[in-house]
């Protein structure tokens, strides 16, 4: 491989991995230096992701090595391959962008709350990028474990009893999920003789019934492991508490962790169990629909019940996951592009909200958190309070924080004209993408239930955000004006600005999502591209 472009695919993994190793021996007193190196690494990864996304959007002919990187020059299915297509490029760009914002936010003060923050952060980025690029299930397990190992340390970063308790629960649940992952992978390999996803997609239909059943059993166990990560009910009891306990930059980047589970479910469902899977086509579809809808309902109830903003954000993650899982499970091809648009919009919004929460709560009265917990446990209090001052001027800091909070509320609720509304509209219009005469007969009860839950979840988010916003910004008891530095508010503004830009550029964005959906709905084309990719030097 003489052309440097051939190695672009591995750099989003190799660069943060190397930087993580370089940062470990640097003394913790030089945190500014470590932060600068880590931020520069994440910035370069983001630029690389943008380049790869642009190449992927132009088509496979413009991709280095046709989008397939063969480690050691061993072809698939025998060797390890990294595969870039529109979906993996999209996830790379989303991950690196969110990581860049979270790392910039941490530079204000949070990276000093513990040891080796930036090394762990780089390992997390490397694990995420590897999970999105790998073409086989075993290396998916490797990158999954790398990502989880880093997330364990990051969740405990900052110490404190709440973080330790939530972190131990998080570790226990994810260790169990990792064990299930390994069992599922072993069953699939024993039955099919391959772990390359493209190769598995071509072999599944030809397997004898007994072997195909073992593959389905292994995939079901594998699915449980990733549904734990995606936060599907009833496997999501750990998520709101863990995410609420994490430090703001960690919680911000954790917004994309649940999307790893969603990504793998999409890959397995549409590539391995797609239209070419024969008798196994659509395997597990009913479970995704049922679990996704129950997750939306559970998340919506949690959003309404939450008085603390951290828990509200955690339950919003569940609503997002349930919306995507049910959309994939319903099996309407027209919904897939809208689901991908929703994935991007909701991840950016929730990431921005997690970063914003600490800034908003920084100026609250010391008893406000106690009051919030008490109200969540025992209900609201009826107090008649007289306002001492009417028409007081709003300080500039609170005005900016309030505006960002309002944007988060509009995006989470899916109200026009922002990207949250466009995403939900695309989902519903994709569901109704059929002749009017067929709507009455073609629409199932599950379809109508999904539309209802989608609308009600937005209503729940709007009610909860209004309630918390009024208590925070219109409270009768005055709190101190929070001291916010530019490096803290800038990442929030940038992420929300990205959502606004996504709203303004909804047309081009939806065209990219539709092209991505078309690729996903052609599994044999993807498999052929991976398996027939030429070895370097043979072209």
Swiss-Prot record:
Keywords of the record, alphabetical order, are: Antiport, Cell membrane, Hydrogen ion transport, Ion transport, Membrane, Potassium, Potassium transport, Transmembrane, Transmembrane helix, Transport
Superkingdom assignment: Bacteria
One Pfam family cited in the UniProt record for this chain: Proton_antipo_M
Which coarse location class describes where this protein primarily resides? Answer: membrane
Q: Which InterPro entries match?
A: CPA3_Na-H_Antiporter_D, MnhD1, ND/Mrp_TM
**GO cellular-component terms in the record?**
plasma membrane
Question: Which residues span the membrane?
Answer: 4-23, 36-58, 78-100, 113-135, 140-162, 175-197, 217-239, 251-273, 283-305, 312-331, 335-357, 400-422, 442-464, 484-506
Q: Where does the record place it?
A: Cell membrane
Signal peptide per UniProt: none
Query: What's a single GO MF annotation on this record?
Result: potassium:proton antiporter activity
- Determine if Cell membrane is one of this entry's keywords: yes
Say what the protein does: Part of a K(+) efflux system which is required for the adaptation of R.meliloti to alkaline pH as well as for the infection process during symbiotic nodule development.
Report the sequence similarity comment from the record: Belongs to the CPA3 antiporters (TC 2.A.63) subunit D family.
Name of the molecule in the record = Probable K(+)/H(+) antiporter subunit D
Q: Which organism is it from?
A: Rhizobium meliloti (strain 1021)
